[in-house]
Amino acid sequence: MSTSPVAIVTGAARGLGLAMVERLLAEGYRVMAADLASAEASWNYELGDINAMSAALEANGEDRLKTCPVDVTNADSCAECVDATLKHFGQLNLLVNNAGVVDSGPIDTFSEAAWDRIFAVNTKGIFLMTQAAVQALEGQENASIVNTASIAGKKGVRHMAAYCGSKFAAIGVTQSLAQELAPRGIRVNAICPGIVGTAMWLEHLMPKAKSTSNEIPDFADYVSQLIPMGEPQTAEDMADAVVYLARTNNVTGIALTVAGGMEMN
């Protein structure tokens, strides 16, 4: 049986999650890539589809990578994802709680349904996946949880009360779990991306965009005014941060900002 470490990555079908999966595979991990079963779930931009990702992976013959559907807002679904991982790989060393959604708008008209959905995915999802995985992580070598937060979890942004609130909460949950789980040998950290040209953000902020920031010349000009280092972050930058936090031995409870100097708190 392989002794290489095993990771679960949620929100894995595209964007940051897909880059994390690819980087973890390159680092020798075996990976369970988890996301919604269909991109047709109702939201203000196209969501990931793990079934489509699974078909592509099977065509490539990658045997260190498996996929499973997960709805991180549903406790049973989270438990089934962890169970599937243990059944296939036999262990779990790293949980990457990356699933997330975004929406924005003035408080006068922002819908209660959107508010609830954002908190359910971005914050409750961390709780449910961690609850499902914690016993499997305990006792494993260098067991670790990495949560995707945001620089919007460190500083409020106009018209983004729900998203910012959910990411502030994600950092608070990270710090609390780091305290609680340290005696059980599990480290818990967060990454805080800056402006990343993923489809989630481009399709929300720039509805005509459908894939990457490279297709939107104005995007680079826009972010260069906001970021001291002059260019947007990439999904690969976030994957680098996940690998660092997964591999280090004595770091827990931090919210690691990867934002080119845009946020220095």
What are these regions, as identified by a protein language model?
Residues 231-258, 263:
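C-terminal substrate-recognition "lid" of short-chain dehydrogenase/reductases
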Residues 130, 166, 174:
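Active-site helix of classical SDR
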Residues 150:
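Residue(s) in the substrate-gating loop at a strand-loop-helix junction
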Residues 106-107, 114-119, 223:
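Substrate-binding pocket helix/loop in short-chain dehydrogenase/reductase
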Residues 182, 187, 250-253:
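Short, small/polar-rich loop/turn modules that mediate ligand/substrate recognition or access, typified
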Residues 135, 179-183:
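Alpha-helical segment proximal to the catalytic Tyr-Lys
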Residues 2-89, 103, 207:
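Short-chain dehydrogenase/reductase
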